[in-house]
């Protein structure tokens, strides 16, 4: 039945014919360059078929015609253009369209990236101009700062509306009151915003300047000169010392290491902690001195800049020799920017700079992030504007459209403009600054820095947390924890027993032999008078330790010293074996941990080159082994091997170690390996199985001849080489099982548990291997012990992706582990289905992810779920992900400051994210929600009073309050108490951390929604009506004092409403209340002319004696109580009948 279901369902015969025509076209064109690699738009084999099984949730996603998936960009554009021609049905229209497209392409055209020829040490020979080698995290420059900031502000409806209102005051017929009444608040808002952006931009400028000003040694004809990183050009010869950052993409020409190779750390580029071995160009490495680089005529041909950090194609040519020397260049001859030199000193020629480097091309441009709260408030202001227009139209309608009604309509729009409060932006921006200050001053999260002060509320709305692994969840330090021999297991507390066995073994070797045959000593020792069991265990320990000390790709490097020539030299093995002088370098931290462990038990690696390695025994004897063959680790084989010959005995041994899934079929039958591997995995240990096989000289010579022939094959070289190696991998002797732990950051487990309880789904995106990522996910409790893990098997085409997605769909409540390659294939065909399924998982682990893939995953989550995302990382490879997320958090740690500098928030440890979210994020959101709604209430209530006042005066467009009263109402009279809400909190910080479930409520957005907004609108209408009608009813005899009466009651009502809203009092809140009340009382003495109806024209001024009477005071108090008391009663009843989640904790 399976082969009856087509892989690509075709809906019509026409579609099928079109598909065959495309296939014929591609066949005719030919493979073209890069045909050996599967491209993004490459056609799949349409003869494949799917198994019979139900499709997933979205049927359309699986039944689309294959033309939707397999059309090349060029073919797609051609098809679109033909459709456009047919649609317009006119040559002149098509000509106009083409001209417009050409103009758009000219205006938006980017510089085309091209391959280049780079002459060594001759930047002036470059044919084209290349970008500056500078790091830029700034959003603006000197010319775009003011326009950019103004655009970012006036794109908000609130600010644009007030700009229009303020400009309308220049029209005499529309003028209401004084100009400063409108322009002063708007100017203040813009000044605060520009100042804040200027400070943030200046800080980014300083950080960029610090990175761009790092000094490097540049090799010239006259010698070495110091040059800034930003001044490096294509063609320069740059010298990079050990532990120094590589400033630009270079081709590796020369090193101080005599082997002609060095190690670099790439964790800031790809997230992998494995050190990468780089090989210098042999032609330049053989030159006697550095200055000889200028005595030859040589150039590098490099491919055009591209995103892929794992590939490079180029050639090195020396044309002053006869015949010219040509060397092919690959990824192992390159030094990418943002990597760190781990050994020796390197010299390279710069081929890419600035935005053409791999690291920058994999980093997205910084964008202006707008918080969800700001977007929600922007929607509410649009609703308020609609209410403003409706109210103005109603007033004009009730006026009977008398006279120039359109002028009255605009005047009403201006009179009620306080429905949309301009002080909203001021209060929110000042609140954000206060939240940032509180975060940086929190002693429980020292070193935390707020770099983007506009989105602190985002910390309280997060649903997805995407985290890096290396250096973020882990300390990036491997520690040897367990050695298992099958019958006996050794842990950290019994390592001294292993050390004793090794010491006794080699001491007896040294005493029983005269250096003639040291390797046979353990066998003779095992035949001594000691018990048989003890001898067996001791012999097995000896063999296991020796295998671990030999089977690796670790190189010991000794501390550098300066030679006579001025070049860096390194201590050789026969010169200096001091332990404090030695460091280990390898492509895997696991291997370094194993070699360090063998050193701790007595067998030390002291020297290694391409042909041999030397071990030092506890007795001080040096054992030399010739390296005959080396089989490096690959993700496909999951194992590595080495064939060595003992120089003392001429014994040839094949050692191998690898993952249990790969080694279980290679080693001899045993009954303990699978069980013990499972036990160690449950402890969070990374396991490796070690085995050996002894070879005779004849066996090795036969293997070597077959292996050499396979390596010379032109076709299927990889498969043939693997087949020859597999002929040795049979019935190998199982020596031991090792367990290594990648130590987690402090308090990672409780922090992840807290985040899960808070309703945050955690995704781990790492460039590391699948096995490593899975192990860390278990040990960190990202995946709980009771949850199953679904490892998404590798897929390469649409059919395989379909099958695997259907298999994954049947799983329930299991974590997903998927590799970057499989992820890209699935996203190419079934993007929506994969994201939908992944979002249902309790945890997701994506391994082997490139920086661009990390950013793409974040973008997909934002687009498909519409939920708030947060990305956290500590390396340069995490910058794109951090910038793509709604909220980016950088950890300043061992991998440098690049992620920290590009993030919105910077912390020093992963565990700090718990308090940052549970306490500061939660408080920031709830405070801003309350502050925003209270400010809108403040504008609505005064607009309601204006509407009542106008209706009393026969719907005349006459202002109730003018001049300083309107400015003071939103500033000195009520601003301090309202702004003091930024100090309010519903529960104590300790409770918020202890009960992270409180955070989960925030993701629903109930603190600020249309429901709560409508409640505040009703409160405003009620209070505004009570204040105005109460003033008119109670003071009918003294109608001339309505302004003073109503305004006084209004101020008291606002102060009481703030007091009723506050849940936790702070001494500054009390000060704010009394300070505002004092300012109002004091202003009555010198602002009496503002409190009369119509002021001078009516001859009405405030009677100071009147406001001091008991009648005035009790009637104002009565109005205020009537406006506030019912609301307090309703609030009290609601808390009793339907208490919020935090009320029990706060009580």
From Swiss-Prot:
Residue ranges that the UniProt entry lists as topological domain Cytoplasmic: 1-144, 195-382, 429-939, 984-1012, 1063-1066, 1130-1147
Record flagged with keyword 4Fe-4S: no
Broad EC category: translocase
Subcellular location: Golgi apparatus, trans-Golgi network membrane
Membrane-traversing stretches: 145-165, 174-194, 383-403, 409-428, 940-960, 963-983, 1013-1033, 1042-1062, 1067-1087, 1107-1129
Keywords recorded for this protein, A-Z: ATP-binding, Golgi apparatus, Lipid transport, Magnesium, Membrane, Metal-binding, Nucleotide-binding, Translocase, Transmembrane, Transmembrane helix, Transport
Recorded GO CC terms: endosome; perinuclear region of cytoplasm; plasma membrane; trans-Golgi network
Domain of life: Eukaryota
Predominant subcellular localization, coarse grouping: Golgi
UniProt cross-references to Pfam families, sorted A to Z: Cation_ATPase, E1-E2_ATPase, Hydrolase, PhoLip_ATPase_C, PhoLip_ATPase_N
Amino-acid positions noted as binding ATP in the UniProt annotation, renumbered to this chain: 468-470, 591, 633, 638, 657, 686-687, 766-768, 848, 854, 877-878
Gene Ontology biological process terms in this record: endocytosis; phospholipid translocation; retrograde vesicle-mediated transport, Golgi to endoplasmic reticulum
PROSITE patterns: ATPASE_E1_E2
Matching InterPro entries: ATPase_P-typ_cyto_dom_N (IPR023299), ATPase_P-typ_P_site (IPR018303), ATPase_P-typ_TM_dom_sf (IPR023298), ATPase_P-typ_transduc_dom_A_sf (IPR008250), HAD-like_sf (IPR036412), HAD_sf (IPR023214), P-type_ATPase_IV (IPR006539), P-type_ATPase_N (IPR032631)
Cofactor annotation: Mg(2+)
Topology in the lipid bilayer: Multi-pass membrane protein
Molecular function as annotated in GO: ATP binding; ATP hydrolysis activity; ATPase-coupled intramembrane lipid transporter activity; magnesium ion binding
Record field: compositional bias (Polar residues): 509-520
Residues reported to bind Mg(2+): 468, 470, 874, 878
Family: Belongs to the cation transport ATPase (P-type) (TC 3.A.3) family. Type IV subfamily.
PANTHER family, alphabetized: PHOSPHOLIPID-TRANSPORTING ATPASE IIB-RELATED, PROBABLE PHOSPHOLIPID-TRANSPORTING ATPASE
Designated name of the protein: Probable phospholipid-transporting ATPase IIB
Organism taxonomic ancestry: Eukaryota, Metazoa, Chordata, Craniata, Vertebrata
């Amino acid at each position: 039945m399976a082969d009856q279901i087509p892989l690509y369902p075709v809906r019509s015969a026409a579609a099928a014919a079109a598909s065959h025509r495309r296939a014929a076209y591609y066949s005719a064109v030919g493979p073209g360059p890069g045909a050996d690699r599967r491209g993004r738009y490459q056609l799949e084999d349409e003869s494949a078929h799917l198994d019979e099984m139900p499709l997933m949730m979205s049927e359309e996603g699986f039944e689309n015609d294959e033309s939707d998936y397999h059309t090349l960009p060029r073919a797609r554009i051609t098809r679109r253009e033909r459709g456009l021609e047919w649609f317009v049905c006119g040559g002149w229209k098509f000509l106009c369209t083409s001209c417009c497209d050409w103009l758009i392409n000219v205006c938006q055209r980017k510089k085309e990236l091209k391959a280049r020829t780079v002459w060594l040490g001759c930047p002036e020979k470059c044919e084209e101009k290349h970008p500056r080698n500078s790091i830029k995290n700034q959003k603006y420059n000197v010319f775009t700062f003011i326009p950019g900031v103004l655009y970012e502000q006036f794109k908000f409806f609130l600010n644009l509306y007030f700009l229009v209102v303020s400009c309308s005051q220049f029209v005499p017929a529309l003028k209401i009151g004084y100009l400063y009444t409108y322009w002063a608040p708007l100017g203040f808002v813009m000044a605060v915003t520009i100042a804040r952006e200027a400070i943030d931009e200046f800080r980014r400028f300083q950080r960029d300047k610090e990175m761009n000003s790092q000094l490097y040694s540049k090799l010239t004809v006259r010698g070495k000169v110091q040059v800034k990183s930003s001044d490096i050009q294509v063609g320069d010869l740059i010298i990079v010392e050990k532990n120094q950052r590589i400033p630009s993409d270079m081709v590796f020409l020369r090193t101080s290491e005599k082997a002609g190779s060095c190690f670099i750390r790439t964790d800031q580029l790809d997230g992998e902690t494995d050190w990468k071995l780089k090989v210098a160009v042999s032609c330049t490495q053989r030159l006697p001195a550095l200055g000889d680089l200028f005595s030859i005529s040589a150039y590098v041909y490099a491919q055009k800049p591209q995103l892929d950090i794992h590939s490079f194609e180029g050639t090195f040519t020396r044309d002053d020799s006869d015949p010219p020397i040509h060397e092919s260049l690959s990824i192992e001859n390159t030094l990418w920017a943002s990597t760190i030199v781990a050994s020796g000193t390197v010299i390279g020629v710069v081929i890419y700079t600035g935005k053409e480097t791999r690291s920058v091309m994999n980093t997205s441009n910084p964008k202006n992030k707008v918080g969800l709260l700001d977007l929600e408030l922007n929607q509410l202001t649009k609703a308020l504007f609609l209410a403003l227009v409706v109210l103005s139209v109603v007033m004009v309608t009730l006026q009977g459209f008398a006279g120039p009604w359109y002028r009255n309509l605009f005047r009403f729009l201006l009179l009620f403009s306080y429905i949309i409060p301009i002080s909203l932006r001021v209060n929110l921006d000042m609140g954000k600054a206060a939240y940032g200050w509180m975060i940086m001053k929190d002693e429980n999260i020292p070193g935390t820095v707020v770099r983007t002060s506009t989105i602190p509320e985002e910390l309280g709305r997060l649903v997805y947390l995407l985290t890096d692994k290396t250096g973020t969840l882990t300390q990036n330090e491997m520690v040897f924890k367990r050695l298992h021999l099958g019958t006996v297991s050794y842990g950290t507390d019994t390592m001294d027993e292993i050390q004793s066995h090794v010491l006794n073994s080699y001491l007896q070797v040294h005493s029983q032999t005269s250096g003639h045959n040291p390797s046979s000593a353990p066998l003779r020792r095992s035949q001594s008078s000691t018990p048989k069991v003890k001898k067996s265990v001791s012999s097995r320990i000896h063999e296991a330790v020796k295998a671990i000390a030999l089977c690796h790709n670790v190189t010991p490097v000794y501390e550098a010293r300066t030679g006579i020539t001025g070049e860096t030299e390194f201590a050789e093995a026969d010169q200096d074996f001091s332990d404090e002088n030695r460091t280990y370098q390898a492509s895997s931290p696991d291997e370094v941990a194993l070699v360090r462990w063998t050193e701790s038990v007595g067998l030390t690696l002291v020297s290694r080159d391409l042909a041999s390695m030397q071990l030092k025994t506890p007795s001080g004897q040096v054992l030399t082994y010739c390296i005959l063959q080396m089989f490096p680790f690959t993700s496909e084989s999951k194992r590595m091997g080495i064939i060595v010959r003992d120089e003392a005995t001429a014994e040839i041994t094949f050692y191998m170690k690898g993952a249990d899934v790969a080694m279980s079929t290679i080693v001899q039958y045993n009954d303990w390996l699978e069980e013990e591997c499972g036990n160690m995995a449950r402890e969070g240990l990374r396991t490796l199985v070690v085995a050996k096989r002894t070879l005779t000289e004849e066996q090795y010579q036969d293997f070597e001849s077959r292996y050499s022939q396979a390596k010379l094959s032109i076709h299927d070289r990889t498969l043939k080489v693997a087949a020859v190696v597999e002929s040795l991998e049979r019935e190998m002797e199982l020596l031991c099982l090792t367990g290594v732990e990648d130590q987690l950051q402090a308090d990672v487990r409780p922090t992840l548990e807290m985040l899960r309880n808070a309703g945050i789904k955690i995704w781990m995106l790492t460039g590391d291997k699948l096995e490593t990522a899975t192990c860390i996910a278990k040990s960190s409790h990202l995946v709980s012990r009771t949850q199953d893990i679904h490892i998404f098997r590798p897929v390469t085409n649409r059919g395989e992706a379909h099958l695997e997605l259907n298999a994954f769909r049947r799983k329930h409540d299991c974590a997903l582990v998927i590799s970057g390659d499989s992820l890209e294939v699935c996203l190419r065909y079934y993007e929506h289905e994969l994201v939908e399924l992944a979002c249902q998982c309790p945890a997701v682990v994506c391994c082997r992810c490139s920086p661009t893939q990390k950013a793409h995953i974040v973008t997909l989550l934002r687009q498909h779920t519409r939920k708030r995302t947060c990305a956290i990382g500590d390396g340069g490879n995490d910058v794109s992900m951090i910038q793509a997320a709604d909220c980016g958090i950088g950890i300043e740690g061992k991998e440098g400051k690049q992620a920290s500098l590009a993030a919105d928030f910077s912390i020093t440890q992963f565990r700090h994210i718990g308090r940052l979210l549970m306490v500061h994020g939660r408080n920031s959101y709830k405070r801003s929600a309350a502050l925003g709604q209270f400010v809108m209430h403040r504008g609505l209530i005064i607009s309601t009073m204006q509407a009542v006042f106008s209706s009393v005066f026969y719907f005349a467009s006459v202002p109730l309050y003018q001049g300083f009263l309107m400015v003071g109402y939103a500033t000195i009279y009520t601003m301090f108490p309202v702004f003091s809400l930024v100090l309010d909190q519903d529960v104590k910080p300790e409770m918020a951390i202890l009960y992270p479930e409180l955070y989960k409520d925030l993701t629903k957005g109930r603190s600020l929604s249309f429901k709560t907004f409508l409640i505040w609108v009703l409160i405003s209408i009620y209070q505004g009506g009570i204040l105005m009608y109460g003033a008119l009813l109670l003071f009918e005899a003294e109608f001339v004092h309505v302004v003073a009466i109503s305004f006084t009651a209004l101020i008291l009502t606002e102060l009481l409403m703030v007091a009723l809203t506050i849940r936790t009092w702070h001494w500054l809140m009390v000060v704010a209340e009394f300070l505002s009340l004092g300012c109002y009382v004091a202003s009555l003495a010198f602002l009496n002319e503002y409190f009369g109806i119509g002021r001078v024209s009516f001859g009405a001024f405030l009677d100071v004696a009147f406001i001091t009477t008991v009648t005035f005071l009790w009637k104002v108090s009565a109005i205020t109580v009537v406006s506030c008391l019912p609301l307090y009663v309703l609030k009290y009843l609601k808390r009793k009948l339907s208490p919020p989640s935090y009320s029990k904790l706060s009580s």
